[in-house]
Structures are given as structure tokens and as C-alpha cells.
UniProtKB/Swiss-Prot annotation:
Gene3D superfamilies: 3.30.1380.10. It comes from Carassius auratus. The gene is twhh. The lineage of its organism: Eukaryota, Metazoa, Chordata, Craniata, Vertebrata. Ca(2+) 2 binds at residues 20, 23, 25. The keyword Plastid does not apply. Ca(2+) 1 binds at residues 19-20. This is Tiggy-winkle hedgehog protein. InterPro entries: Hedgehog, Hedgehog_sig/DD-Pept_Zn-bd_sf, Hedgehog_Signaling, Hedgehog_signalling_dom. GO terms for biological process: animal organ development; cell development; cell fate specification; cell-cell signaling; central nervous system development; neuron differentiation; proteolysis; regulation of gene expression. GO terms for cellular component: extracellular space; plasma membrane.
Amino acid sequence: NSLAISVMNQWPGVKLRVTEGWDEDGHHFEESLHYEGRAVDITTSDRDKSKYG
């Protein structure tokens, strides 16, 4: 929640989105933590890539 709140405070009206938390399709490298359910891919709701670090 703290990351989502930080996003909303930095950019009012923008929300944090989790796009993938478990990789079933093999899109990540072989040793990725996505295969253990210990990693997530995230974006912002406006999908503005200039906000990504």
C-alpha cells in the first residue's frame, strides 16, 4: 500500500497497476522470481513511461 499511496501523492488521479505477478507463459528469464510468485510487474494507470524509474 505504501507504494500505491506514494504514486497517488506524487501524481493525483494516477493509480499503481500490477500487470503480472505469476508468469505462466515464460515471458521472464529462467531464474525469475515470477515463477515463485515473489515478483511483480507494475505500471501506472496512465501508462506514462516517463514516470517509470
